[in-house]
Amino acid sequence: MNKPLKILLVSPEVAPLAKTGGLADVAGSLPKALAAKGHEVRVAMPRYRQVKEVNYLTDLPVEMDGSLETAVIRQGKLPGEAGIPVYLIDNYKFFYRDGMYGYGDDAARFNFFCKAVLSMLPWLEFQPDIIHCNDWQTGPIPLFLKVKHEDNPFYRETATIYTIHNLQYQGTFPRNILKTMALSEEFFVPERLEFYGQVSYMKAGILYADLVNTVSKKYALEIQTPEYGERLDGLLRKRAADLRGILNGIDYEEFDPATDRRLAVNYDADHLEKKGENKAALQREMELPVRDVPVLGLISRLVSQKGLDLLAAILDPLMQQDLQFVLLGSGEDYYQQLFSRYKVKYRDKMAVKIGFDPVLAQHIYAGCDIFLMPSRFEPCGLGQMISLRYGAVPVVRATGGLEDTIKDLHQYPGVGNGFTFRDYQPQALLDTINRALHVYRHEPGEWRKLMRRGMAADFSWSASAGHYEEMYREALEKRRAAMFKVG
């Protein structure tokens, strides 16, 4: 019987405390699934202005540029029976702002955060077996452990995992950040932190963590190629033996159409007619005519990664059909303005809400018939899993986690759970939507089977947490083997 592990998950955002994207959902859900398997799990994140329910623990000094900054350590907890502790690193200068990222001093802000986390653990007397880091904001932690704490007995047996949620966001900064990190110029070489004339926090995490993973098996393979590797494919190929792909999950208690209080009407796979009542409620909410036509939904950041150029290219021919389209998202001005113009052009068929509204998102999952994710690349994707749960049939591009989770009905008769295309071309997307519409309109029995298969699928966190558990133990063995080699 393996002994329970002590795990610290470090993330720049954790739902429901602070969220900009899917990383927050992962950081809020995975700890609960690990705790359910008997492990002692704690979480660390910055204390942003919007995080309210916290208790003061202590002040700790953190060295920055030769002077001392104060890290105020506060504690909250994740909702749920386990009450998992969340440690919040507070500093008014660095984190009391309107947003979470995108500031000129992000390099210093998250350098401070990473140093503060490693200063906090001895004070807490919480000695983790695993520090699980997530995305570029936490990349310096594996580096600091190997370079700054290599002789610190407190961390002697601690292994690090570094999870890449999206390789496109790399945390690259000017060379002078090395001084703030208290690192010599020796680190500004391609074999270490130098990345095309800058310093990369993402590269630090990939290079110095004991094991690295990303959030689907397919994406773990894709990022080792020039097409998807964002100029880090060479390093990732070098670390291929230490690179894993573990699919994210979704919280099946939160995302359950039978109990979701945000819905107009609750339903399950045995009462699919009630999904139609949610469609009518969505049409009324979005000021569309209440008609029995197929409703397509899209919930997305409005950025080029999400395949919106393909969608824009086919909207005119698509909207000539007898259907409706509901879009929720925010992002690049170009796409916000483009879709807002189409909303005016097709006002009886198309509804657009710019922004993020979590309640409306649930109404779209419950009210739409077809859910679109035509992504150029998609490390994992949660939207397609949620749409399956709510009986909305996904139309997706076969890439990353979308390929790992969605099987095309026509390629896999009797087991398919959606519709997929591979060529990144507008016509391929339109043809695939039309295939889905044909089944919806002309094969209603097959469509109901498709809905039920999706609703019965298991993309809960339990299986994914088991894979992380295996990876944690593997990282510990790797760490101990390295210690004995040195010792």
Swiss-Prot record:
Could you say which residues bind ADP-alpha-D-glucose here? 19
Q: What NCBIfam families does the entry give?
A: glgA, PRK00654.1-2
Enzyme Commission identifier(s): 2.4.1.21
Ordered alphabetically, the record's keywords are: Glycogen biosynthesis, Glycosyltransferase, Transferase
Q: Which SUPFAM superfamilies match?
A: UDP-Glycosyltransferase/glycogen phosphorylase
Name the family.
Answer: Belongs to the glycosyltransferase 1 family. Bacterial/plant glycogen synthase subfamily.
Q: What is this protein called?
A: Glycogen synthase
Q: Which GO terms describe its biological process?
A: glycogen biosynthetic process
- The highest taxon in the source lineage is Bacteria
Give the InterPro entries listed for this entry: Glyco_trans_1, GS/SS, Starch_synth_cat_dom
Q: Which organism is it from?
A: Moorella thermoacetica (strain ATCC 39073 / JCM 9320)
Q: What does this protein do?
A: Synthesizes alpha-1,4-glucan chains using ADP-glucose.
Q: Which reaction does it catalyse?
A: [(1->4)-alpha-D-glucosyl](n) + ADP-alpha-D-glucose = [(1->4)-alpha-D-glucosyl](n+1) + ADP + H(+)
Q: Tell me the pathway.
A: Glycan biosynthesis; glycogen biosynthesis
Residues forming coiled coils:
none
Q: What GO annotations for molecular function exist for this entry?
A: alpha-1,4-glucan glucosyltransferase (ADP-glucose donor) activity; alpha-1,4-glucan glucosyltransferase (UDP-glucose donor) activity
